[in-house]
C-alpha cells in the first residue's frame, strides 16, 4: 500500500523544477483561463518561504504592486504552473523571510549571491 502511494506521488511530480530558495527572485508563469481562452500570466517577486514535502511542496512569492505588498502561494508541482524561472539569487541568513512584510524600501533589499568559481 505504501509503495503504491509513493509511486503515484512520484508520477505527479514535475521533473523540470529549477533549484531555488528563500531570497531568490523568481518569475512564475501561471496558466489563467479567461472566457474560454487560456493565457500565461507572469508573477515576479522574491521567494519568502519554501516548503519541501514531495508532491505537496509549496513556496510563497512576494512582490510590491502599486505600493501595496502582494503575496501568492504556489504548489510547485501544480498543473497550473507553466514554468518557474530564477532571475536573481539572493543571499539571506533565514529560511523564512516573513520579516519583509513589515519592511519597505531600502530595508527590504536582499543582497545578491555572487556565483562561485
UniProtKB/Swiss-Prot annotation:
PROSITE patterns, A to Z: RIBOSOMAL_L19
InterPro entries (alphabetical): Ribosomal_bL19, Ribosomal_bL19_CS, Ribosomal_bL19_sf, Translation_prot_SH3-like_sf
GO-annotated molecular function: structural constituent of ribosome
Coiled coil: none
Keyword Transcription (UniProt): no
Pfam families: Ribosomal_L19 (PF01245)
GO terms, biological process: translation
Keywords: Ribonucleoprotein, Ribosomal protein
N-terminal signal peptide: none
GO cellular component, one term: cytosolic large ribosomal subunit
HAMAP family: Ribosomal_bL19
UniProt similarity note: Belongs to the bacterial ribosomal protein bL19 family.
Function field: This protein is located at the 30S-50S ribosomal subunit interface and may play a role in the structure and function of the aminoacyl-tRNA binding site.
Protein name according to UniProt: Large ribosomal subunit protein bL19
Gene: rplS
